[in-house]
């Protein structure tokens, strides 16, 4: 997403692009299987019937991950204030450090930011199956002398619609109120959302 980053930081524009960038055509995700923070299955079906905001990171991340999760908690509050149905959105933190981040630990971690946030992880192969579909690469860096390592990962938040289609991406840094306003416009005008509302 270098081109999106470039657009947001082009000094000649003088105006930032929207924090939430949606795609002209949505791409259906292929099946994947992870484990959620209650040791249950987290798969493509877990993303259907609601809008999902997905962030990849790891618990030992010193800055980007806690900051983004906190910002997403603010995004959620702003969305609810705009009348968006809480049951129709979910925020998912997926750990790309399965060697250290276990289900119970992930659950405590995400619930600190919001009690309804969902955590998940899986093997490197399982994670790669999903991250490649979303264009969210990750890589464990070499260990230091004291056996500590970092994980390089995307800082973006990925939006999947209630049909399991990759719909857009939130480019940091972002303002919670702006993201909520942009998503509210999408939510209220989207044909997928309208179909869900009719079936409720």
Residue ranges and their predicted role:
Residues 29-30, 51-52, 154-156:
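Short loop/turn microsegments at loop-to-beta-strand junctions
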Residues 36-37, 161:
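Short, acidic, Ser/Thr-enriched surface-loop or helix-capping motifs
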Residues 42-72:
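Short active-site neighborhood of thiol/selenol oxidoreductases, capturing the structured segment around
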Residues 58-59, 94-99, 124-125, 136, ...:
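Solvent-exposed coil/turn segments that connect beta secondary-structure elements
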Residues 69-130:
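Structural microenvironment flanking redox-active thiols in thiol-disulfide oxidoreductases
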Residues 114-117, 132-140, 151-158:
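Structural micro-motif
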Residues 143-200:
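Thiol-/selenol-based redox modules, centered on thioredoxin-like
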